[in-house]
Amino acid sequence: MAYYGFVTTLKNVRPHPNADRLQLGDCFGNTVCVNLDYYEGQVGVYFPTDGQLSVEFATQNNLLRLKDENGNNIGGYMDPDKRNVKAIKLRGEKSDGLFLPLSCLDYCYPDVYGGAAKVLKVGNRIDICNGHEICKKYIPKGNSRNSNAGGTSRTRKRKVAVAPLFSEHADTEQLAYNLSAFRPGDEIEITLKMHGTSQRTGYLPVLKGYKRTLKDRIFRKEGEPIYDWGYVTGTRRTVLDDYEGGYYGSNEFREAHSKLFEGRLWRGETVYYEVVGFTTNGSPIMGVCNNKKLNDKDFVKRYGEITTFSYGCDPDGCHGTELLKMFIPNDESEETRVVREPQSDIYVYRMTMTNEDGDVVEYTPDFMRYRCEQMGVKTVPLFAKGKIAMSGLVNLIDYRTEEDFIVAEGDETREGDPLSYEYLPGESVKKAAEIFYDGPDPVGKIHVREGVVVRIINRPKFTAYKHKNFSFKVLEGIIKESATAPDMEEAQEVENE
């Protein structure tokens, strides 16, 4: 989970409507609050939400809360321990990230006349400058959610790979900082980004044991590994030996979902999916949030006082073998068939085919949906498909309404500047994504959606970018502020550090 600050320019600087000493500006389309010293076109460093500034950087720029002997604040606004960048509202206006002048990095270049401005240019991304750590992904430190879990889940830690062809799913980068990745002729699709825990299952060559010669036995060597086709399941970073223990106290909720693919995957297939809802003890898979902390009455009126990312699941719903009966056809009568809501559910977002030489073929989204329909599993909801024209405009089909229309960033937003065909496609794609990235979750309909994922279909390798809405970013920040532990994916990042 890489995190960077971006050297960029501050645009659309304007007065804050509710604060005389503040201004608003835009970075990558995100609104930031700045003081009156900032100006249009100023070059600086933008730190997106969900990052953590280093102690050195925050101290050098007087960002940490500090009180004098009389209890008066003489420092900044950041918690000295967390130092996290989060989405907030200041006097009723969005502030989505942190923008600082480029001079904030001058201390990294003491021997360079002119400081950071002589070294860094617009477009650079930074996490370390001249040997000085600047920022990293913010991950709350702590133990697993269930301190009585009796240890973490057992994962395979051997010199020989258990499933050498079982590939991890790469992190999905932010759309706003990768607009240049889009080109005329690209085909795209926009799907729902779901807030859950990642899982993957493959039908691949799996380690079954070792062939030991007499020499191996004498010298106590393991011998030559023996592989045969079998099913293997893991989280984003680990391969699971079993479903005991783990971050959630038990990984039992994962088991039924992995078994669903047994007898259904073709040889060489790997399926990547999001698990949402609740664990077998009824705890939410992802953190909950008190919506009143947003100080937004309209949000509370729309989504209630508590956000639980349930996606239509029930904490007391069916699980285990009962859950399998929901998905696997059987000969039971309608009277005995399970009708309760699931305790957790899965949504597939990617599938691959890997041959025995390790060559990976990426399934197109349409073929992935075809295979999932054959297997009886759900895929992430599809919002729209489109193609970028040579003009840079996006011809989009809204799959919710079957409406066909064109999305573009027009001349009026560029104040008369000529259209840049190199950059316009990405801007058009971002605008298209923002048609769908906010509002109630289309699955459960009781909480805000996280955002969307924009995938470029015509690339040989999986190429996709996420775009989260502001309300979710604020919720995510509040959840992390009060968290005693990172979420599942972030917990694994800590383990891998």
Region locations from a protein language model:
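Core nucleotide-handling region used for phosphoryl-transfer chemistry
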Residues: M1-E497
